[in-house]
From Swiss-Prot:
One of its GO terms (cellular component) is extracellular region. GO terms for molecular function: pectinesterase activity. The lineage of its organism: Bacteria, Pseudomonadati, Pseudomonadota, Betaproteobacteria, Burkholderiales. This is Pectinesterase. Its main location: secreted. Involved in maceration and soft-rotting of plant tissue. SUPFAM superfamilies: Pectin lyase-like.
Length: 396
């Protein structure tokens, strides 16, 4: 991509969503920080990311539009009610989900969750009808689903997410560590926090991943939710890597410190706060926000739009990468196959980037060791782009 400097004045409609009018001096497109042109940016919208699903190579287009969000909870009528204090029909979230699955049908089931802390593992199985899980309390921090599990947790005697079944592995593993997992399609959530409370270092291992939420079913909408962890906080990907699933996060909060939004799924983060925390790794640590493992034939991985990237825990300026490619299943560069191995895809546009973001090189080498490269590359060119971003970390 040639180096260009553009003056932008836009008031665009992307996927039916009105963006704020802005006047901005666009960052110069460089080999290490490629910027989309005005023309190219038209291909990377909410509508384009959410348009298709199914088998990679033969995707089905249904032009799904999730931008209306979950809806106002005041208009919901709960089919099932949960309260940790015992004041409702069910004391656990999982018990209510199990009841909804047992009742079956195709109509959407509404599960209200009273403000409180729910220390449990949650599974929404593939067999579940459409479910809306919500709290009437608009502060997502007041209704928390939390569990303590991690990749290195010894499997013997430990509970793992019930969506995953049994395993002969010695440790729980990354995906099995999820506090909440959604395998059904058409899942909605609002006003909730999903958290993994694992304290890194409790069990020795180089991989300290601990998932708070795993979305594995298609057409998930999550609005005003918080997803909190450290390494590998939010996982997005189908149970079969030949399939594409879609998730839409609206006005939500995601926090972590290493590869904390990862997977092969297609997801949009619209009006979200994506927060890097330096509390565990230290102020000067170098880390990564996104770690997509997008299939090479899938043009859409992760899109962050109208969002805010900030930091907490005294993170140093110019310390955090926006992301790196997760070359899932690839042990090293000698095993990487161009056009066949995963090649993560991310676009960050119309967003505010904090001073913690690295200016000259916001995209790091892949997990298999591929050096970041945007053109004329020995390996597949990275698919990471920006457009019309602002803030100290944007390069503007």
């Amino acid at each position: 991509m040639q180096s260009t400097t553009l003056y932008l004045k836009t008031a665009a409609f992307l996927g039916g969503c009105s963006l704020f009018a802005a006047t901005a001096l666009a960052a110069t497109s460089t080999a290490t920080r490629p910027q989309l042109s005005n023309a190219d940016a038209r291909a990377y919208t909410i509508a384009s990311y959410m348009a298709s699903f199914g088998t990679i190579g033969s995707l089905t287009t249904d032009n799904w539009d999730p931008t209306g969000g979950v809806g106002a909870v005041s208009g919901f009528r709960a089919n099932y009610a949960v309260a940790a204090d015992g004041s409702a029909q069910y004391k656990t979230v999982q018990a209510a989900i199990d009841a909804a699955v047992a009742d079956g049908g195709v109509a959407r089931k509404y599960i209200s969750v009273k403000a409180g802390t729910y220390n449990e593992l949650v599974c929404v199985p593939e067999s579940a009808p459409p479910i809306t899980l919500y709290s009437l309390d608009a502060n997502a921090n007041n209704t928390v689903i939390v569990y303590n599990n991690a990749n290195p947790t010894p499997a013997s005697g430990a509970k793992t997410n019930p969506c995953m079944g049994t395993s002969s592995n010695a440790t729980v593993g990354t995906v099995r560590s999820a506090t909440a997992m959604v395998r059904a399609s058409n899942f909605n959530a609002r006003n909730l926090t999903f958290k993994n409370s694992y304290v890194e270092g409790t069990f020795a291992d180089n991989n300290q991943s601990a998932v708070a939420l795993a979305v594995r079913g298609d057409k998930a909408i999550l609005e005003n939710v918080s997803v909190i962890g450290n390494q590998d906080t939010l996982y997005l990907g189908a149970t079969n890597n030949t399939m594409v699933i879609r998730a839409y996060f609206k006005n939500s909060f995601i926090q972590g410190d290493t590869d904390f939004i990862f997977g092969a799924g297609t997801a949009v983060f619209h009006g979200c706060t994506i927060q890097y925390t330096a509390a565990r790794l230290g102020a000067r640590a170098t880390s990564y926000v996104f770690a997509p493992s997008t299939a090479p034939d899938n043009p859409h991985g992760f899109l962050a739009i109208n969002s805010t990237f900030n930091a907490t825990g005294n993170a140093s300026n110019n310390s955090t990468h926006l992301g790196r490619a997760w070359d899932q299943g690839v042990s090293g560069t000698s095993a990487y196959i161009n056009g066949s191995s995963p090649n993560g895809q991310v676009v960050i546009r119309d967003s505010s980037l904090g001073a913690h973001i690295r200016l000259a090189d916001p995209w790091g080498p892949s997990t298999a060791g591929r050096p970041y490269c945007s053109s004329k590359c020995a390996y597949s060119a990275n698919r990471f782009f920006e457009y019309n971003n602002t803030g100290a970390g944007s390069g503007n």
